């Protein structure tokens, strides 16, 4: 028997749980639409990275197997088979929600169902807003198929010259920055591509439009960087980002159009790829025909529309922790260590702390890691302001996938302001989230640290659940000082910390040691691990051994889980759960009954434990330890948003009509009650 679930199929199962949220009839309609948007965006990234990587392994005949022993070709086939039915489910769900929205006055209307007055408005919109922005190509002997960037959205048409009767093909690119949903009247929307399609004869004069289809391509978007050859890492990353849009096509999505037109488009793309990538045979791309609009990720335009608030869940306002109500945040932290649970407790104190430090004359230095900070960052702006007055050192991780460009921009801005900027660590990704502020008061140096499971991004802090920790304890600060020194000197793998634990050297051995300690207690042992993913085979094997010793193990794994629970003789004492709800579960909390409870930036994956700089933080303060344990206990009682994984890889929603509990709703109400 195979001891592990396949990584890729386990991720797809997570995305299925996201799709299930869109099916939840208890949710407001735009909330359901939001989950369809998330589902599609997730799948885009899965194809850009995971499927693209498997294709590379297959095409280069690299004998690499998944944790379950499946080779790349087998995994690609399993992915295609898994999605074949689910894509149809997604389409049906969209059509159901679309019909319900129509009854509420939000109408996504096909162009051919518009009346004459509405079509006149669409024509005006085309002339004023779209005509100058679309890029039409007539494909003939002098105009070959152009390169298509990742996530290109376009129309492909068969056209006939009215004079010569010659039939040819045309490509019309639609820019990504246009509004997809055009509101012709209050609540009446038509898709931009349908407006363009209806006016193609204005782009191809003296031609008759015979057939047309919308299509979208997804390309390999992984960035390969040879760090050994990098003299200017920022410049190398900048050049690599320019190449991202030139990746090989891995997925084709089409809508409408005849089978003949579809075959012509597919053949054209394959021919283009064969010549562009100099392959002996056309590359195999996954091709899907859609009965609904392409790219449901654009549904965010409707979800965020200001006119339909009654169709959305009410906004929750995060609460300010009472200990941060004082004007001087540093005094609050000096009094006691504090732990916040975002988004229920506000992220504002983190931003305020940096802003206060930047303007405080007693501040000597600020050291910080930045992983994903977003395009509009008050934190970076505060650091830029501080850099003109005090010592500011920032480690900006340029390898944060899909945030490379934003991070590069902020790194350059910080450098211009006078900050010392380090672009990551050689062959490691810095994923630890840490901040160290040093002040001088009463002729003494005082250190303040902030450590977190989540990013320094106020926007994501409103939708991701994370814990963040504030301390003025010297033993913690000393470890962080040591770690920053090692990062600045590129010797991260050689640092041994005293209070905290750091990957790639310390976290995995520590977790294994903690599992072994619970094994010594046999049936009295108890482990709860909450993470985004569990993939590391060594950790999984130790959990199997602990189960066989009688240790009770509860795993709360939001996404990928390669461990097989409830297998007789292997994992009978292991239960695996996943919570998918309004907020994205992102905190990593690790509880060991006979030792301690920890929080971490690291998931239980080889990349986190072996190829990244991560932190594992013990909760030595009893109040903080109890708060972390309370989070786990409530999530294990969830009967509305919790799924359980069985030994066959199936997820089933946990239900108890007599005791309904949504853990995320509970924490919202608890925050209101407490504060």
Cite the ranges covered by each PLM segment.
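N-terminal localization/anchoring segments of enzymes in phospholipid and broader phosphate metabolism
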Residues: 1-527, 545-549, 561-585, 589-675
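Catalytic-core loop-and-flanking beta/alpha module that positions acidic residues
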Residues: 542
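Hydrophobic alpha/beta core scaffold segments
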Residues: 552-556
């Amino acid at each position: 028997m195979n001891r592990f679930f396949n990584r890729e199929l386990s991720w797809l199962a997570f995305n299925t749980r996201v799709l299930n949220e869109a099916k939840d009839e208890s949710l407001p309609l735009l909330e359901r639409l939001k989950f369809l948007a998330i589902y599609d965006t997730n799948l885009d990234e899965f194809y850009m990275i995971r499927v693209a990587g498997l294709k590379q392994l297959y095409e280069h005949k690299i004998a690499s197997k998944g944790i379950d022993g499946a080779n790349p070709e087998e995994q690609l086939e399993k992915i295609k088979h898994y999605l074949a039915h689910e894509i149809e489910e997604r389409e049906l769900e969209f059509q159901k929600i679309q019909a319900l929205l129509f009854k509420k006055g939000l109408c996504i209307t096909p162009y051919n169902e518009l009346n004459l007055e509405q079509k006149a408005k669409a024509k005006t919109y085309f002339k004023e807003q779209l005509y100058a922005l679309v890029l039409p190509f007539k494909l003939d002997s002098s105009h070959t198929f152009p390169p298509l960037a990742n996530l290109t959205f376009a129309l492909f048409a068969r056209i006939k010259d009215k004079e010569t009767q010659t039939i040819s093909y045309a490509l019309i690119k639609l820019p990504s920055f246009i509004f997809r949903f055009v509101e012709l009247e209050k609540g009446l929307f038509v898709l931009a591509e349908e407006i363009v399609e209806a006016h193609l004869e204005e782009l191809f004069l003296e031609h008759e439009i015979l057939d047309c289809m919308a299509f979208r391509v997804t390309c390999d978007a992984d960035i390969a960087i040879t760090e050994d050859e990098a003299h200017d890492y920022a410049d190398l990353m900048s050049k690599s980002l320019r190449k991202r849009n030139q990746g090989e096509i891995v997925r084709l999505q089409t809508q409408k159009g005849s089978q003949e037109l579809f075959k012509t488009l597919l053949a054209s793309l394959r021919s283009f790829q064969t010549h562009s990538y100099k392959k002996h045979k056309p590359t195999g791309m996954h091709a899907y025909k859609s009965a609904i609009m392409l790219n449901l990720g654009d549904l965010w335009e409707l979800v965020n529309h200001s006119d339909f608030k009654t169709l959305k869940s009410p906004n929750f306002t995060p609460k300010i922790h009472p200990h941060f109500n004082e004007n001087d945040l540093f005094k609050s932290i000096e009094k006691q260590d504090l732990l916040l649970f975002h988004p229920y407790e506000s992220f504002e104190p983190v931003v305020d702390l940096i802003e206060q430090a930047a303007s405080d004359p007693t501040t000597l230095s600020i050291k910080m890691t930045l992983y994903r900070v977003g395009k509009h960052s008050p934190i970076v702006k505060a650091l830029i302001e501080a850099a003109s007055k005090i010592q500011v050192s920032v480690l900006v991780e340029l390898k944060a996938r899909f945030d490379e460009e934003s991070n590069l921009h902020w790194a350059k801005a910080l450098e211009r302001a006078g900050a010392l900027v380090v672009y990551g660590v050689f062959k490691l990704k810095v994923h630890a989230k840490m901040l160290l502020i040093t002040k001088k008061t009463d002729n003494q140096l005082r250190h303040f640290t902030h450590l977190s499971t989540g990013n320094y991004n106020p926007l994501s802090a409103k939708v991701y659940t994370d814990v963040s920790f504030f301390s003025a304890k010297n033993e913690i600060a000393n470890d962080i000082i040591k770690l920053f020194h090692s990062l600045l000197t590129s010797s991260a793998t050689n640092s041994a910390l005293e209070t905290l634990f750091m990957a790639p050297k310390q976290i995995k051995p520590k977790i294994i040691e903690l599992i072994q300690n619970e094994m010594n207690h046999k049936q009295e042992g108890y482990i709860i691990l909450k993470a985004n993913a569990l993939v590391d085979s060594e950790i999984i094997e130790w959990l199997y051994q602990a189960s066989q010793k009688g240790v009770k193990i509860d795993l709360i794994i939001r996404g990928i889980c390669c461990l097989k629970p409830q297998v007789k003789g292997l994992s009978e004492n292991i239960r695996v759960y996943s919570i998918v709800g309004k907020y994205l579960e992102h905190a990593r909390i690790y509880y060991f009954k006979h030792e301690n409870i920890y929080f971490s930036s690291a998931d239980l994956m080889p990349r986190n434990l072996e190829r990244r700089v991560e932190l594992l933080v013990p909760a030595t303060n009893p109040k903080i330890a109890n708060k972390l344990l309370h989070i786990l206990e409530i999530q294990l009682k969830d009967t509305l948003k919790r799924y359980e994984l069985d030994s066959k890889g199936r997820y089933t929603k946990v239900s108890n009509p007599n005791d309904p509990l949504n853990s995320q709703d509970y924490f919202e109400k608890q925050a209101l009650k407490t504060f």
